[in-house]
């Protein structure tokens, strides 16, 4: 008998959702991704789309899972637009605690925006960061 190998991290709540061990309100699924309503929504219809295979963040997620998440997010966006008729949508991915990631299983937020709500906001302030030219040079120079 062949034993099915789990792709889950035993301590991950999102892996528990994928495996059916944690209750969720599933709204969509494909072969490699799963979509469910956020337990702490910032708007009606706030949906999370996750890969079924555990990955800590966007950068560590395999390409097949990234594609599946993106396609399912698009499907969820169309469903949200059709059924809830928001004025717009935000697609949000946070990577790392400093960026606001709270569950360390890659996930994309699909957040409907309504006439009375705020768009995706962040604090804009002057910083002492490098110039745009310095960042461009760092990102485009050849690496040894």
Swiss-Prot record:
Pfam families, A to Z: HIT
GO biological process assignments: nucleotide metabolic process
Gene Ontology MF terms in the entry: catalytic activity
Alphabetical list of CDD domains matching this protein: HINT_subgroup
Location of the motif Histidine triad motif: 105-109
SUPFAM superfamilies: HIT-like (SSF54197)
Source domain of life: Bacteria
Name of the featured protein: Uncharacterized 16.1 kDa HIT-like protein
Organism: Mycoplasma pneumoniae (strain ATCC 29342 / M129 / Subtype 1) (Mycoplasmoides pneumoniae)
Highest classification ranks of the organism: Bacteria, Bacillati, Mycoplasmatota, Mycoplasmoidales, Mycoplasmoidaceae
């Amino acid at each position: 008998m062949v034993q099915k190998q789990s792709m889950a991290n035993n301590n991950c709540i999102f892996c528990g959702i994928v495996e059916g061990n944690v209750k969720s309100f599933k709204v969509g699924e494909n072969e490699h991704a799963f979509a469910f309503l956020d337990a702490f929504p910032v708007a009606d219809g706030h949906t999370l789309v996750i890969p079924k295979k555990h990955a800590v963040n966007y950068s560590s997620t395999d390409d097949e899972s990234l594609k599946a998440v993106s396609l399912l997010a698009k499907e969820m966006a169309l469903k949200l637009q059709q059924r809830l008729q928001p004025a717009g949508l935000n697609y949000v991915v946070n990577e790392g605690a400093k960026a606001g990631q709270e569950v360390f299983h890659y996930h994309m937020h699909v957040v409907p925006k309504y006439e009375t709500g705020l768009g995706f906001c962040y604090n804009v302030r002057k910083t002492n960061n490098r110039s745009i030219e310095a960042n461009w040079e760092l990102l485009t120079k050849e690496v040894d």
